[in-house]
Amino acid sequence: MTITRPDITASVPLLEPPGWALAERALFDLLDHAWRHFARDFTGPDGRLTYRDTLTSRDGADDFYEVFFNWPQLYLLGGADDLLAEAGRHWEGVTAQLTELGMLAGEYERGYDWFHQGESLLLLYFLTMADPARWAGRAVRFAELYVDPAHGNYDPVRRIIRRPHNGSDPD
């Protein structure tokens, strides 16, 4: 997917950066330190969260993704050059981890309410916004779970999602 961006040329000289811009850069530096510290201390080499237990209910998949969901946004705003790749690595690692814990099938929540699925998907949404060429295929595949009746979520006659707990394995 090719994105066309307009050329923008600055025409007003800037003698000194405004205070808000300096504060924003200081915040980005602080956030850069924070995400690196978190990744070093609380995740494994493949991006998984350090979690060695089992899950005892359907709830919880969203919590694994939520710690990373704003990393692509920070990257887009001017965060570290390696932040987007790290966010993707953590999505991959957490997705593998949750698959092993039985929470996902085909990289998607097996079946839970839409509110929690939406929380799980925030990271993917922002990864797709930041790097559509890499992530848009997954977004389309996941959307097909809700528009293709063969997946069991969508009832084309009534034009509704068939049950409150739905996903990649809704039955």
Task: Explain the meaning of each model-derived region.
Residues 1-171:
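Glycan-recognition and catalytic cores of secretory/periplasmic carbohydrate-active enzymes
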